[in-house]
Regions:
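Conserved N-terminal catalytic core of the sugar/cofactor nucleotidyltransferase
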Residues: 1-5, 31-104
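N-terminal nucleotide-binding beta1-loop-alpha1 segment
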Residues: 1-19
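Conserved alpha/beta core of the MobA/IspD/sugar-nucleotide pyrophosphorylase nucleotidyltransferase superfamily
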Residues: 1, 158, 172-252
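Short beta-strand/turn micro-motifs composed of small residues
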Residues: 7, 53, 109, 133
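Short beta-strand-to-loop acidic/aromatic patch adjacent to the donor-nucleotide binding site
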Residues: 101-113
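Conserved core of the sugar-phosphate nucleotidyltransferase
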Residues: 115-196, 200
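Short catalytic helix/loop segments, enriched in acidic residues and glycine
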Residues: 20-35
């Protein structure tokens, strides 16, 4: 099992905390965000971790090498003009190595805090594409937002499969959980993921975004539509997202 952390972001809403550090190195309750992710992944038995940086790449690179001996470091030089999917594909070489070595691959956002227990549940899923879903999302969202519906996204599950995610909801009935930014590709499925990416129309719009700025949820939705759903790895809290300075006051 390998993992790739997408850590190219600037984190403008966390300024001035991100003036001298990338977003993933902001401190939360005594540790940097990326510390929690690496410790959770390693604690669940992930054998190899790669990181894609962007903003203040050399700061992140130095920290990864000195604190965690992580050498698989990739750079999204266009981090300020692209989004998550492009950041992930900056590590295409790493994705292809998972295919060659028959290693499943966990993809993690870099601004979330989660436990090894959540990673273990994801590892245990046997689906080609598995997505962690928080069924108790409203507990966290009500701490973060005056109106949770405004920031939440749709997520629909049927018979253990995620069929839709990432759209703007009209009501709470359209939200059966929240995507937290943590998912897994099986090594059998990764070639199809790369083929699907290569087949996408570079001139098209994806949920209102151009190809280079496509949301990860739009990409995952495309895979779901093409290949028939994704396994829902259901959790009940136990994680948090750090997007605003106020999030730093919330306990996971």
């Amino acid at each position: 099992m390998k993992a790739l952390i997408l850590a190219a972001g600037f984190g403008s809403r966390l300024m001035p905390l991100t003036q001298d550090n990338p977003k993933c190195m902001v401190e939360y309750r005594g540790n940097k965000l990326i510390d929690y992710e690496i410790n959770a992944l390693r604690g669940a038995g992930v054998s190899e971790i790669a990181v894609v940086g962007g903003y203040l790449f050399e700061v992140l690179k130095s920290y990864m090498e000195s604190q965690f001996s992580i050498k698989n470091l990739y750079q999204n030089k266009n981090y300020d003009k692209t989004n998550m999917v492009q950041t992930m594909l900056c590590a295409r070489e790493f994705l292809e190595s998972c295919v060659k070595e028959k290693q499943d691959l966990i993809i993690s956002y870099a601004d979330i805090v989660y436990s090894a227990e959540i990673v273990r549940a994801l590892v245990e899923s046997q689906e080609p594409l598995s997505i962690v879903v928080d069924k108790d999302w409203r507990t966290l969202w009500e701490k973060r937002f005056a109106n949770p519906l405004l920031d939440a996204e749709t997520l629909k599950i049927r018979e253990g499969k995620v069929l839709e995610l990432g759209k703007k909801p009209k009501s709470y009935e359209e939200i059966e959980g929240q995507y937290i930014g943590l998912f897994k590709f099986s090594h059998h499925f990764l070639p199809q993921v790369l083929e699907f990416y290569d087949s996408l129309d570079r001139g098209a719009m994806y949920d209102g975004k151009d190809f280079l700025n496509m949301y990860m949820t739009s990409f995952l939705q495309g895979l779901i539509d093409r290949f028939g759903g994704a396994g829902a790895v259901e959790i009940h809290g136990g994680w948090c997202e750090i997007d605003f300075k106020s999030d730093l006051e919330i306990e996971c």
